[in-house]
UniProtKB/Swiss-Prot annotation:
HAMAP family for the chain: UPF0270
Organism (species): Salmonella agona (strain SL483)
Pfam families xref list: UPF0270
Family named by the database record: Belongs to the UPF0270 family.
Protein known as: UPF0270 protein YheU
Recorded name of the encoding gene: yheU
Superkingdom of the source species: Bacteria
InterPro entries: UPF0270, YehU-like_sf
Lineage, top ranks: Bacteria, Pseudomonadati, Pseudomonadota, Gammaproteobacteria, Enterobacterales
């Protein structure tokens, strides 16, 4: 289920994004990006609609994923 990120308190959203960035081992290519840059990238992707905030009933967890990968 997609969670509308706009309805979350700013601190809650920031904490979810930071948690996501910390557990993702994404390779950013030749130039490593700072934690702050990664957080800003994820926030931008949520704002643009490229990424969505998702609740998994099966795992009882919240995750962030590319919108094109989300299946209801």
């Amino acid at each position: 289920m997609i969670i509308p990120w706009q309805g979350l308190a700013p601190d809650t959203l920031d904490n979810l994004i930071e948690s996501f960035v910390l557990r993702e081992g994404t390779d950013y290519g030749e130039h490593e990006r700072s934690f702050e840059q990664k957080v800003a990238d994820v926030k931008r992707q949520l704002q643009s609609g490229e990424a969505v905030l998702v609740w998994s009933e099966l795992h009882e967890t919240v995750n962030i994923m590319p919108k094109k990968q989300f299946r209801e």
